[in-house]
């Protein structure tokens, strides 16, 4: 696989959802499909920022059962995670042979910009799907059937680019005892491998805990952390998600940047809200760093001011921060991450992250 191609959300109002991410996260309009392009079933607004592409889809009629069932059960959420691949037919054939449920067989769509080959299978959880995309013979910005004559957002003329570059990983949450079957599906069907894992002995707070396995494709350009709750005194944030999403689904999307301080400063100025981190986290961090040979290039006072978390080992470090939920329900949120020679997933920050989310769970009456 060549990486993530795009992520598709099914939402109640595609125009308004896309506009939110344009205004708050600094995305730009990329493409549109709807009545004006001959699509009588769905309106889809596609936005982008550097190599990140997100599509938001809503139906144009009230008789689409799949959409109605999805919204009745889940509400707004990620419907499809698409991968950029070189050989759609081969990956699809191997996946179906290994037990994947086909949604749409390999097919080509074309316009004046060229040809795109696509195929879709069900993922191992919920109604979420995976689409394989080969755009090697396509010069357009997204897909045939879309118009690229879309308005530039006025905010882009008065605000600076945020600097989010690509999708680093996509995280899904599952009910207890469901993580391992999902991991095994990715190993068997897509030939992914186990890249990283933690269990409840490592990741726990006073009240709750989790288990997580990250699976990756052969190139390790696609990474999918898979979480499940573990037994605790109270309800974990993983179980809270499963309860409110009414099943397994995508919990958060991590967006990679090369300058997290600049990106978070701009996102905050745009109105994005983030989880807060207590001062004790940074006091403890400074003490630990005194006994480490690792040099953090960024100013710790600035990281503390912005509530950015740090995880590190002897070779490098990562900086990460998590938005508050972007839906009314405690389901989807985003992570902003900067990697400095570090391929981990912030295991050292899981406890702090869990405690921050638990403080919010308590205000929601869900802890």
UniProtKB/Swiss-Prot annotation:
Q: Name one Pfam family in it.
A: Glyoxalase
Q: Which GO cellular component terms, listed alphabetically, does the Swiss-Prot or TrEMBL entry include?
A: phagocytic vesicle
EC numbers listed for it are: 1.13.11.27
Q: Which GO terms describe its molecular function?
A: 4-hydroxyphenylpyruvate dioxygenase activity; metal ion binding
Reaction catalysed? Answer: 3-(4-hydroxyphenyl)pyruvate + O2 = homogentisate + CO2
Stored Gene3D superfamilies: 2,3-Dihydroxybiphenyl 1,2-Dioxygenase, domain 1
GO BP annotations listed:
L-phenylalanine catabolic process; tyrosine catabolic process
Q: Which family does it belong to?
A: Belongs to the 4HPPD family.
**What is the name of this protein?**
4-hydroxyphenylpyruvate dioxygenase
Q: Which organism is it from?
A: Dictyostelium discoideum (Social amoeba)
Q: Which gene encodes it?
A: hpd
């Amino acid at each position: 696989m060549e990486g993530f191609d795009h992520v598709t959300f099914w939402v109640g109002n595609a125009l308004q959802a896309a506009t939110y991410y344009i205004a708050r996260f600094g995305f730009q309009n990329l493409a549109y499909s709807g009545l004006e392009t001959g699509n009588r079933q769905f309106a889809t607004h596609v936005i982008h920022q550097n190599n990140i592409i997100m599509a938001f889809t809503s139906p144009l009629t009230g008789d689409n059962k799949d959409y109605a069932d999805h919204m009745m059960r889940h509400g707004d959420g990620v419907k499809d995670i698409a991968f950029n691949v070189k050989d759609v037919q081969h990956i699809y054939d191997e996946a179906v042979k290994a037990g994947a449920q086909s949604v749409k067989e390999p097919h080509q769509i074309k316009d004046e910009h060229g040809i795109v080959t696509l195929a879709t299978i069900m993922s191992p959880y919920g109604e979420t799907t995976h689409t394989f995309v080969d755009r090697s013979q396509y010069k357009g910005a997204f897909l045939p059937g879309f118009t690229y004559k879309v308005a530039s957002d006025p905010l882009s003329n008065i605000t600076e680019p945020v600097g989010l570059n690509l999708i680093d990983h996509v995280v899904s949450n599952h009910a207890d005892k469901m993580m391992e079957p999902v991991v095994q599906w990715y190993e068997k069907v897509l030939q992914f491998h186990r890249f990283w894992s933690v269990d409840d002995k490592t990741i726990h707070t006073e009240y709750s805990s989790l288990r997580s396995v990250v699976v990756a494709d052969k190139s390790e350009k696609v990474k999918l952390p898979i979480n499940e709750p573990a037994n605790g005194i109270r309800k974990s944030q993983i179980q809270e998600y499963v309860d409110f999403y009414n099943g397994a689904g995508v919990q958060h999307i991590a967006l990679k940047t090369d300058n997290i301080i600049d990106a978070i400063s701009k996102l905050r100025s745009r109105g994005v809200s983030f989880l807060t981190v207590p001062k004790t986290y940074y006091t403890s961090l400074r003490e630990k760093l005194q006994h480490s040979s690792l040099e953090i290039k960024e100013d710790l006072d600035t990281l503390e001011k912005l509530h950015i978390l740090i995880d590190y080992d002897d070779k490098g470090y990562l900086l990460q921060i998590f938005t508050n939920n972007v839906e009314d329900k405690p389901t989807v949120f985003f992570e902003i991450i900067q990697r400095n020679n570090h391929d981990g997933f912030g295991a050292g920050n899981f406890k702090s992250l869990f405690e921050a989310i638990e403080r919010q769970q308590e205000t929601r009456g869900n802890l």
